[in-house]
């Protein structure tokens, strides 16, 4: 889904980072410095190394265009839900979970 959001609404959304909603926000490392908002929808557990690990098997990703936000009070965004499996790595006591998803942006430059 592609849509638009007012600048104030976006800033309010990005300031919310409640543990209860399991929503996370971080800057995407691309040349446009867009923003990504990730929401965990469902959990599933898988056994690994005789321990149960939780993976996010369904996530919702919304990407907000920072470039448009700078020019106008509207910000373009694209939203999609993914079913994905995370891979895990461990370094000492630090665990990381990663996954790769492809979000196709056909109409990113559409007008509001």
Language model segments and positions:
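Viral virion structural and adsorption modules
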Residues: 1, 5, 106-112
